[in-house]
Each structure stands twice: as C-alpha cells, then as structure tokens.
Design a protein with these regions (language model features):
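Short alpha-helix boundary/capping and kink motifs at helix termini
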Residues: 37-101, 113-114
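Short intrinsically disordered terminal tails
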Residues: 1, 148-151
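A short, basic-hydrophobic beta/loop patch
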Residues: 82-149
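Intrinsic-disorder-associated interaction segments
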Residues: 5-8, 30, 62-65, 127, ...
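Residue-level detector of alpha-helical secondary structure
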Residues: 16, 38-41, 73, 139-142, ...
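Short amphipathic alpha-helical segments that mediate assembly, nucleic-acid/protein binding
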Residues: 8, 12, 34-37, 69, ...
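N-terminal extension/subdomain marker
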Residues: 1-32
Length: 151
C-alpha cells in the first residue's frame, strides 16, 4: 500500500531567498507589511480565525486590509496552525522553472515570515507539488539553489 503524502518541513530562510519581500498585496495598491503586523500587535488588534477561502474550493471574497492583518495575527498567535502551505513551481510555456510559488497560504506565510524575523520560527510545513531538487534545497538537503529549467 502506498503511503499518502503528508507534506514536508522546509526552512523559512530558504523560502525567503525566493520571497524576499516583507509584504503581500491582497487588495490592489494596499500592500500589507510586516510593520503593519507589528503595529496591529502593538495596538491589540484582534485576530481572525475565519479562513479567507481556498483558491480552488471556495472563491475568496474581497476583504479589507485590516481583515487580512487580523488573519495573519491568528497565525502569529497560533504558530502550530502554520501548516499545509501549498507550493508548486513556476513554469513557462515549455519548462518547469526552479522557482517555488505559493498556491495557497499567504496569511500563513506572512505570519511565518513575521515570526522568523523575531527569531521564534525557523521551519514550516508545506504541501509541495513541484520539483524534487527545489524541495531538497528548501529542506536544506542541498547547499546550492537549483538553476536549471526542466523541459
């Protein structure tokens, strides 16, 4: 019997090499930064436990920036829930590129990034559907970032 895939543990520092920005934009021209998250914590903004939606199962509704910050705060306050971030690889017309992309889990990623900056979180759980060499790099098994495209 084949074992069901339950995900992988990857290094946040390796993900940051691909995603160095400290912000994400759910709403056009309204980026949410790690500084916004810190401001919300300092001002005791309440967290949001209700999920945003799944891009495949449930169409996400338009939410305010404050709602997204509150959702990030939920994961900051409950880091054990930072799991199942869905990753794949970027692709071009004919090639699979050695670049991971986040399919689902941006609130979790922003919380993980925030906690990493504090020095309190270094690894996260993901569901990875991409190239094995890129996964090995993200896990810390390879020292060199893959560069070659695969046809």
């Amino acid at each position: 019997m084949e074992e069901k895939y339950s995900g992988d543990i990857i290094l946040i520092s390796r993900m940051i090499e691909y995603f160095p920005q400290k912000s994400f934009e759910w709403n056009a021209n309204e980026p949410i930064t790690l500084d916004d998250v810190q401001f919300a914590i300092n001002h005791h903004l309440s967290e949001m436990a209700i999920p945003f939606g799944d891009t495949f199962k449930y169409p996400p509704k338009k939410r305010t920036s404050q709602w997204h910050i509150r959702r990030i705060l939920y994961f900051v306050n409950h880091p054990q829930e930072i799991k199942n971030i869905e990753l794949d690889n970027e692709s071009s017309t004919f090639d699979i590129l050695p670049v991971p992309i986040i399919i689902d889990g941006y609130h979790r990623w922003m919380a993980a990034r925030y906690l990493y900056e504090l020095g309190s979180l270094h690894k996260i759980h993901c569901l990875y559907a991409g190239r094995e060499d890129v996964l090995d790099y993200l896990k810390g098994k390879l020292d060199t970032m893959p560069q070659e495209e695969i046809a």
